[in-house]
């Protein structure tokens, strides 16, 4: 969910966090993360060298246009708030143009819950970098990590905070909406699909639905309510990259990581550089 429209609505975000789980607002306990970069949650597995391509449409202010997102699990890690997080590299294309290149930092605790520890999203206009205003890093500037996927998701679980970054108006929440759903995407048809509902309390009428299946992860994204962006995506391809492709991804992701120390020096300078899990 884009945050530019809600960055000034932090008062509403504060109200939302007042009722958030203590685990999501009090900071991480590194002792609960003995092997954080190994993410094997059944509903959200992130194996290094895996690339997911989702395609569909979205309205980014120019009407509904072709939209494609490429999520790549790198073999890099970065220490965030005392936890060694796995680095993902995301590329967001709208109307055929690259609009955003992003590093995200995820970790799995010993119970199997997957956490979001921060994001460095570069924005581009006509191929030129314009900045990364929505950057947030857990443990810095009041930001706190949030939950991406529960260890044991089921209907009736209380909603959970996906991250808390008041400086940019980020306070997205999620809840398990349905289980046992059947959903067909270009890759194949899946049964026993888990559906989550996501929203920002500052935009209570705008919701995003995400569909997950065991052993794969996110296979579909849909919009609900008054979500003006109307992002709709389906899983188009899952790729297990060769050693050469993984090496290229590593180099490109490290370029973003190095550039972040200049583009968002106020936050990023407090973090150590990303590094490979093993020697390249």
Regions found by a protein language model. Give the residues of each.
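Conserved functional acidic sites
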Residues: 23-280
């Amino acid at each position: 969910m884009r945050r530019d429209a809600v960055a000034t609505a932090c008062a509403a975000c504060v109200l939302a966090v007042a009722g958030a789980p203590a685990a999501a607002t009090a900071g991480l306990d590194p002792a609960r993360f003995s092997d954080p970069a190994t993410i094997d949650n059944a509903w959200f597995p992130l194996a290094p060298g895996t690339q997911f391509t989702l395609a569909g449409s979205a309205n980014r202010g120019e009407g509904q246009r072709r939209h494609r997102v490429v999520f790549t699990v790198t073999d890099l890690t970065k220490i965030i708030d005392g936890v060694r997080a796995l680095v993902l590299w995301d590329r967001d294309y709208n109307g055929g143009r690259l609009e955003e290149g992003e590093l995200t930092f995820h970790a799995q605790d010993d119970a199997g819950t997957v956490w979001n520890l921060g994001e460095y999203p570069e924005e581009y206009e006509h191929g030129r970098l314009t900045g990364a205003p929505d950057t947030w890093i857990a443990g810095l500037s009041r930001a706190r990590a949030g939950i991406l996927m529960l260890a044991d998701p089921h209907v009736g679980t209380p909603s959970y905070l996906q991250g808390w970054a008041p400086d940019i108006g980020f306070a997205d929440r999620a809840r398990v909406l349905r289980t046992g759903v059947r959903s067909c995407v270009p890759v194949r048809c899946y049964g026993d699909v888990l559906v989550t509902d996501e929203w920002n309390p500052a935009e209570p009428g705008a919701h995003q639905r995400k569909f997950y299946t065991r052993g794969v992860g996110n296979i579909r994204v849909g919009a609900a309510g008054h979500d003006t962006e109307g992002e709709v995506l389906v899983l188009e391809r899952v790729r297990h990259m060769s050693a050469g492709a993984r090496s290229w991804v590593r180099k490109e992701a490290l370029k973003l990581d190095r550039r972040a120390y200049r583009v968002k020096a106020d936050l990023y300078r407090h973090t150590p550089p990303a590094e490979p899990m093993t020697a390249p």
